């Protein structure tokens, strides 16, 4: 079947990517010389995907230039701070058909997208040994029949998915039924999928290691792009390193500090001189 469009989800705050995600949306981070979301848009266009939609929320204004540069369309998700990514699926409900469902912060070393796709699937890589990722098994027909959070020696969810028109209609029907339930707000769309494997038929698209990357933290990005070890492109981290008279690479183990909702109030980190906290609102640096 021919692909109708691609939905790139870019509404979330990516608080674990502190402090870079406080200064700039994670999708706008430069990775190996390319803006993360621009690389994905180019790969979709190279595959001749006719329509590309970006679902925005946090720092939505940073995506405006993509309209003119690439001819993509933006859809705003007003609930990005109070709901998980099921709200981005809901925001795109009128355009879901034969659709790629993508995350703005994935990096594909090779182009995984195709103009024609046989059936719905979720991209996966294989874990040798234990993993905390979402692991899948398949039945004799190749359809996903179990999904567990954590496992070992298993294929795990990594990257994009493809929904055909029938899958989209079934999923949206289920989502509509549960959307206003309080427990739904915090769920990933994948969690809803897990609860309906009997009716939401999807296969595993298996990729070799080194094909799909995601960066949840600065440390993970530094492993992939070592230029970030001593040049984080972060005004905040440059100020911190100057104030402490250390190199940026000496700022490690960064963790967000939450302020009671989904946004971060600052971050904590380790340095050669001890453990510190930095607060965004007043640019305060405190040693613990």
Residue ranges and their predicted role:
Residues 109-184, 255-288:
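Conserved core of the sugar-phosphate nucleotidyltransferase
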Residues 4, 50, 97:
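Short acidic/polar active-site loop segments enriched in Thr and Asp
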Residues 231-251:
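Short, non-transmembrane alpha-helical segments in secretory-pathway proteins
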Residues 143-212, 219-238:
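Catalytic-core segments of class I nucleotidyltransferases/pyrophosphorylases
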């Amino acid at each position: 079947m021919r692909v109708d469009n691609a939905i790139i989800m870019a509404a979330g705050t990516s608080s674990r990517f502190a402090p870079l995600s406080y200064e700039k949306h994670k999708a706008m981070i430069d990775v190996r010389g390319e803006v993360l979301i621009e690389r994905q848009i180019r790969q979709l266009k190279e595959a001749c995907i006719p329509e590309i939609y970006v679902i925005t929320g946090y720092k939505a204004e940073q995506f405006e230039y993509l309209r003119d540069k690439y001819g993509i369309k933006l859809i705003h998700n007003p609930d990005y701070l109070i709901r998980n990514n099921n709200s981005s699926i809901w925001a795109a409900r009128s355009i879901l058909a034969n659709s790629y469902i993508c995350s703005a912060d994935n990096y594909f070393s090779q182009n995984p997208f195709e103009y024609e796709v046989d059936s719905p699937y979720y991209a996966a890589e294989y874990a040798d040994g234990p993993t905390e990722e979402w692991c899948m098994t398949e039945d004799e027909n190749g359809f996903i029949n179990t999904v567990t959070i954590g496992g070992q020696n298993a294929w795990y969810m990594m990257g994009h998915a493809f929904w055909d028109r029938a899958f989209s209609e079934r999923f949206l029907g289920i989502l509509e039924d549960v959307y206003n339930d309080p427990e739904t707000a915090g769920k990933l769309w994948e969690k809803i999928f897990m609860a309906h494997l009997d009716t939401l038929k999807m296969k595993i698209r298996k990729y070799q290691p080194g094909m799909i990357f995601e960066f949840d933290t600065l440390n993970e990005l530094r492993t992939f792009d070592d230029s970030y070890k001593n040049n984080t492109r972060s005004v905040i981290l440059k100020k911190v390193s100057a104030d402490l008279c250390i190199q940026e690479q000496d700022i490690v183990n960064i963790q967000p500090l939450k302020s009671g909702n989904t946004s971060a109030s600052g971050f904590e980190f380790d340095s050669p001189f001890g453990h510190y906290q930095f607060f965004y609102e007043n640019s305060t640096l405190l040693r613990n």
